[in-house]
């Protein structure tokens, strides 16, 4: 599983990339945006040293999220993205090609436990 913890200005949230029943899903929630439709986009680099200006070009459009009148978006999207190819890249929340928030996608703590468990079982330990 991969995770992106968003904490950019007043925009906050958590987005998970995980397999659910054999399909990859994007799950989470975001707060702090105005009501409307926004895009989730994976960018080439995970370099946020200069904010969203240094994350490179857009590579993968994940889908649109819809923010309600209370400023909350609940995310539940299907994706064909291979989770392990996006770790270390940046995820942006954009509207009209303007990047409003961006953070780096990392490996989640839960994923490390699963990998450790599978390694133990494969070695017969």
From Swiss-Prot:
One of its GO terms (molecular function) is metal ion binding. GO terms for cellular component: host cell cytoplasm; virion component. Disulfide bonds join 52-102. GO terms for biological process: superoxide metabolic process. It is found in: Virion; Host cytoplasm. Keywords: Disulfide bond, Host cytoplasm, Virion. It comes from the Viruses. Belongs to the Cu-Zn superoxide dismutase family. Superoxide dismutase-like protein with no enzymatic activity. This is Cu-Zn superoxide dismutase-like protein OPG175. It comes from Vaccinia virus (strain Copenhagen) (VACV).
């Amino acid at each position: 599983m991969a995770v992106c913890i968003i904490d950019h200005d007043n925009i906050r949230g958590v987005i998970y990339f995980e397999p659910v029943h054999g399909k990859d899903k994007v799950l989470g929630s975001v707060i702090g945006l105005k009501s409307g439709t926004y895009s989730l986009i994976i960018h080439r680099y995970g370099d946020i040293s200069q904010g969203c200006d240094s994350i490179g070009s857009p590579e993968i459009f994940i889908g649109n999220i819809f923010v309600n009148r209370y400023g909350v978006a609940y995310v539940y999207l299907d994706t064909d993205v291979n989770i392990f190819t996006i770790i270390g890249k940046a995820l942006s929340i954009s509207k009209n090609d303007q990047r409003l928030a961006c953070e780096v996608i990392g490996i989640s703590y839960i994923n490390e436990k699963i990998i450790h468990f599978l390694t133990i079982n494969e070695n017969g330990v």
